């Protein structure tokens, strides 16, 4: 009896400690806000079918080029890149932008909604000019991503899911971004910043505030995902064709 009670108490303590890091898809979507606070759309004054949106002439030309990458009669295959184009033009995806994508690609609007609500990379709420996405999944967490998140919140004066008053920065937590070997890391717009310390992320934010784009990649000095001390194998060009093959073959 005592053992069971102690075990339950211990489990409850672990749950409380790790709860923020054990997140399913629905919880993540609610927390992240910008990607999709809900999997359904509800009209607001800022986001409704009458919200003005149309592609620029330049982007209409880009859409024509995108569609040509797919077989004739399969415009629907271009939903993802055309949604991305709409988001890059507008900064986020109001329902009117999704409707325009459906119109241009000649597909039912629901086919576009399905995609836009599935992928968290599509922002269905306005975000700042610099969209800071902090990975807090296990590898980054073990490399102290909490210190990175705390440094950002302190530097910008906002919490997860919020945007700075000047609309310059939006901060969210995200699941694994696939750069675990360079943890901890964040994604800002399209760029990865890796091997971070709290000081690194503060410097990156200062550069962005100054209108500069910091160099992406590791901040530790290593190249890409090579070992911190440099290569230990593949240190010279590979041998040419036929190397090691018997002369009689």
UniProtKB/Swiss-Prot annotation:
Organism: Pan troglodytes (Chimpanzee)
Keyword ATP-binding: no
GO cellular component: mitochondrial inner membrane; respiratory chain complex I
Domain of life of the native organism: Eukaryota
NCBIfam families attached to this UniProt entry: nuoE_fam, PRK07539.1-2, PRK07539.1-5
Gene Ontology biological process: mitochondrial electron transport, NADH to ubiquinone
Localisation: Mitochondrion inner membrane
Transmembrane helix in keyword set: no
Residues the record lists as Phosphotyrosine modifications: 193
Family statement drawn from the similarity comment of this UniProt entry: Belongs to the complex I 24 kDa subunit family.
Name of encoding gene: NDUFV2
Function: Core subunit of the mitochondrial membrane respiratory chain NADH dehydrogenase (Complex I) which catalyzes electron transfer from NADH through the respiratory chain, using ubiquinone as an electron acceptor. Parts of the peripheral arm of the enzyme, where the electrons from NADH are accepted by flavin mononucleotide (FMN) and then passed along a chain of iron-sulfur clusters by electron tunnelling to the final acceptor ubiquinone. Contains one iron-sulfur cluster.
Catalytic activity, as annotated: a ubiquinone + NADH + 5 H(+)(in) = a ubiquinol + NAD(+) + 4 H(+)(out)
Protein name: NADH dehydrogenase [ubiquinone] flavoprotein 2, mitochondrial
InterPro entries found in the cross-reference section: NuoE-like (IPR002023), NuoE_dom (IPR042128), NuoE_N (IPR041921), Thioredoxin-like_sf (IPR036249)
Enzyme class: translocase
Residue interval of the organelle targeting sequence: 1-32
Modified residues (N6-acetyllysine): 61
Record CDD domains: TRX_Fd_NuoE
Cofactor (UniProt): [2Fe-2S] cluster
Co-factor binding details: Binds 1 [2Fe-2S] cluster.
Record keywords: 2Fe-2S, Acetylation, Electron transport, Iron, Iron-sulfur, Membrane, Metal-binding, Mitochondrion, Mitochondrion inner membrane, NAD, Oxidoreductase, Phosphoprotein, Respiratory chain, Transit peptide, Translocase, Transport, Ubiquinone
Binding site for [2Fe-2S] cluster: 135, 140, 176, 180
């Amino acid at each position: 009896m005592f053992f069971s009670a102690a075990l339950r108490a211990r489990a409850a303590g672990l749950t409380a400690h790790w709860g923020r890091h054990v997140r399913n898809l629905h919880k993540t979507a609610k927390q992240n806000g910008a990607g999709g606070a809900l999997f359904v759309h509800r009209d607001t004054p800022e986001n409704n079918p009458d919200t003005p949106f149309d592609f620029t002439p330049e982007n209409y030309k880009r859409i024509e080029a995108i569609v040509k990458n797919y077989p004739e009669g399969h415009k629907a295959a271009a939903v993802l890149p055309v949604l991305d184009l709409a988001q890059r033009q507008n900064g986020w995806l109001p329902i009117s932008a999704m409707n325009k994508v459906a119109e241009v690609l000649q597909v039912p609007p629901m086919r576009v909604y399905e995609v836009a609500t599935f992928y968290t990379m599509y922002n269905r709420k306005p975000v700042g000019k610099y969209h800071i996405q902090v990975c807090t999944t296990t590898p980054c967490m073990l490399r102290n991503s909490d210190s990175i998140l705390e440094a950002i919140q302190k530097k910008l004066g906002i919490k997860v899911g919020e945007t700075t008053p000047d609309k310059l920065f939006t901060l969210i937590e995200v699941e694994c971004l696939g750069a675990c070997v360079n943890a901890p890391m964040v994604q800002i717009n399209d760029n990865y910043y890796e091997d971070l310390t709290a000081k690194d992320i503060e410097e990156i934010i200062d550069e962005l505030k100054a209108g500069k784009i910091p160099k992406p990649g590791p901040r530790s000095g290593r190249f890409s995902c090579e070992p911190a001390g440099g290569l230990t194998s593949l240190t010279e060009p590979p041998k040419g064709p036929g190397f090691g093959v018997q002369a009689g073959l």
